[in-house]
Amino acid sequence: MRPIIEFCLSNLASGSHDAMEELEKDPNLDIIEYGCLNHCGTCALDHFALVNGEYIAGDTPEELVSNIYKYLEENPMF
């Protein structure tokens, strides 16, 4: 089972698209786009994704990618 990374379309339009494109290169991740993930207050402030249901954010797309991999390293699925 691979980690699931969920992105909000509104947040992608705000700059997280670069993070999603980088993560899509990793065959060990499942990337899913949704219209809304119901994090509207923080969506307007940060780049974010849900990683296995956990909210992960970053000030930049690069920081978001780094924080996602850090979370996955600290919280292995097996």
Swiss-Prot record:
It holds the Pfam family DUF1450. Transmembrane segments: none annotated. Disulfide bonds: none annotated. Coiled coil: none annotated. NCBIfam families: PRK13669.1 (NF010190). Belongs to the UPF0349 family. This is UPF0349 protein ABC2936. It comes from Shouchella clausii (strain KSM-K16).
